[in-house]
Amino acid sequence: MVKLNVHNFMKKIATYVHPERGFLPDPDPLLELPLAYRAWDELNNAMPELLHNNDFRDALNNIPQLDPSGIKNGPELDRSMRQLSMFANAYVNWGEEPVKSIPKNLAIPLWEIAHRSGRPPIASHASIVLSNWRRIDPDGPIVPENLKTLQNFFGGKDEDWFYLATVGVESVGGCAMSKLFSCLDAIKNNKSNIVVTSLNDLASIIHKINLALERMYEHCRADIFYHRVRPFLKGWPDDGIVYEGVNEEPKIFFGGSAAQSSLLQTLDAGLGITHPSDKSGPFLIQMRKYMPPNHSKVISLLELDPILLKYLNKNKSIELKDAYKKCISGLNIFRKKHLEMAIHYISDQEKKGEEGEGTGGTEFITFLTTARNETHLLMEKE
């Protein structure tokens, strides 16, 4: 096992994670692209109405093929990635007839933008959540009440809230990263009192994350989510989708998933929670490919050396172990709540009609159950 150089790690982390926002972008997501890309902004704004009228595919087929080389890295790239990937999901997943390919006027720029973003050319958590909000009061907090989405499929309050409540979870969890990293820094300097304080602070933040997660129920109804939001977030079918003008070989990519959030995997890695089961571990590893590369690097760096677990094994302090156990307990509660939420929004809806996609929902429930059991097992060991 590689030994983690905490000093070098902290220097790298400073460029990957915001000390307050965590994995949310800073500055706020861009509100419009340069004029040369107005066609994308216009389709972005018209998408809900076009989907309602079953006109989206025709509209997309008729937009010009734009050269993405003029898109700058940073906010412009993030906005383009969100727009183009959500266009692709809408094109493939909603229409009277299934399609086998994405037209080249979308496929070519999407492929290039995705390559520059370091992510697959499909809508993922980083686009539909992390880069899909603006503040109503620019000086106000990043909380659901002060946010509006930048892009929707059908639109409506339920879809808005699904994205914005998740932004709220990411926002609350942003400070968790600085507490975790201050804990690691204190271990390096053998300051046990700061380690304990940092872990207790982290446990408090995890509790707030759990409260933020529960807010999903406030304005996102399960039947609306299942029938009007979830279909657009699906991955590509088993026979794949061709990106015209890029490659004639059909590609298969996963759809958007909360497992693509870097927040929970970072907490797992920092606290030493592992997922050895073949029902959880491989899926979590795959989901890292859908994260912004700098975010997944944080997880990989933390996994190099479980210094917190080693410190716990050497230090017999009851205060230290209690503080650590609070963190694990909080994550166990999070996974329990997330499992209950998935059952409510997916499994229960599948049972109500013939439109359910039983296997997809069942597999995700199995993953969540296994991940929760692995967290619970570590809690019982401590």
Where are the predicted features?
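Surface-exposed peri-terminal alpha-helical interaction modules
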Residues: 1-382
